[in-house]
Amino acid sequence: MTFQDSSHDKPPKDDMPPSPDRPIDSSGPYCISAIYREDVATFDFPIGANLTIMQITHDGDDRDRTVSVRTAGEIRLRRIPKDSSRGTKAFLTVDVHVSDPSLHVAKTWDHERKVLQVSTPQYARLASSGPHCVSLEVTAWFPEDAEFSNLLIESFDLTLRVIEDIKINVSGESKFATVLGRVAFPSASLLGSSTELPTTTSSTALDGSGSSSAGKASSGVPFSSRRILVETVSGSISGCYPLMDYLGMTAQSGSIKVDAFPQPVLPDAPKPAELEVQTASGSIEVNLPVRDALSSKYIPPPRNYITSIHSSAGSIKGSYYLGSTSNFRSMSGSIHIVTMPVLQAGSSDQSGLPQNTFATHTVSGSIKAEVLDPVFITMVPYVEERPERPPHPTPYLPIGDDDPYIIIPPSTNKALFKVDDPESFKSKTLRNLKSSHGSQSASISISYPAVWEGSFHAKSMSGSIKWAGDGLQIIRDKNGFASHEVLLRKGVDSEKEGCFVEMSDIAGSLRFAVGTTI
């Protein structure tokens, strides 16, 4: 092992974690004290299988006689340069700078399992004074349109970064997990025109047989994976992510601020598009593209969307889709969101349609939710292909028209959808959404589009209840001892028809609007 003095490489000014503004091709270390550079280690790997990259730590020598050592840096996913001497063969590079030549960084490459493990010391017996640091940059270089089965990137100290020039597809699961570092995907501004929103349904619509011409991501997000898991303890999560079958994000004290671009369903194995985001104390902001004044013709891929957003103490903001299940919960943080229903038209009491649910709940944080005009879709039942079986005699009589039996409606978990004609949206009403909005001490303000039809029930112990909207009929407006109860209807004769909105509070005010603001 040889070392070079890299103090002339213009390292950062201090030993802070790497800045988001750090040049992508900077050759300097991530900490100023790491002035000795090891020879760059290189490992070739084949595409098409699994790939695992891990950064772990080891204790080093006896802690009683050693000094602590910090690790800083990144694990990066990048596209191979066009002028690369390796052509289009994928490879890994490990670039190490250390503050003392005695520091040992272990690198292990298991070619059979496709696993790279890099271990950095937490402590070391060193003669020189500190602070001591290991600067580590691991880069996975991929050819364009590389494909993998599964991808696992894990680290204790490092930031995990996907560079905007990458273009790979993972058919299975991709997991990015770090304890102290951030997780950063490219931002929508860096991706540029590749994330322009579609304004027609041609790329996502299904014909009567349930086939689809959308084999790839319609929005051109460069990193594609059916399932993506992103986890960090103290770092933040940022960037632009595809929403295919599952997008899960978890942070303890770090914040989450991302854009999510929905992608078409996989016709051969249709699943819901599930978005799950959780934090303990960090804030959450996820933005999915919705139909608004700037993109009034946008049509998302017709799918069943499932959303679960939860924070113990952080606020929740952003724009989301309302599908079969949508839950937003925070203990002490506020919930301020814009939502767009992507649902089947009609009521749950008609044609056996399942009831869709939308819930927002806090303990002390305020709630403000706006429901936009819906995008209506129609289910195309998915028929799983099974090998034909030869007919065989049966001692049982076939079921006749007069025999009792149950018709089970198709499940949205295994179904294809097509977008209804956008011109027909104006003649349809939103009648298939059951909502609940509750808080203990904070105010709640909910607005629904003019096409909403159903019942509204609200109850508050000491707070006021106000409403606005054409066509709302007062069924009950009752003021009792330490309580106020209201029941309204629009376009229905009973609570069993159309949508149903339940609002409850102990001390906060309640505001409900249909087709207007209040």
Locations of regions flagged by a protein language model:
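Intrinsically disordered, low-complexity terminal regions
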Residues: 1-518
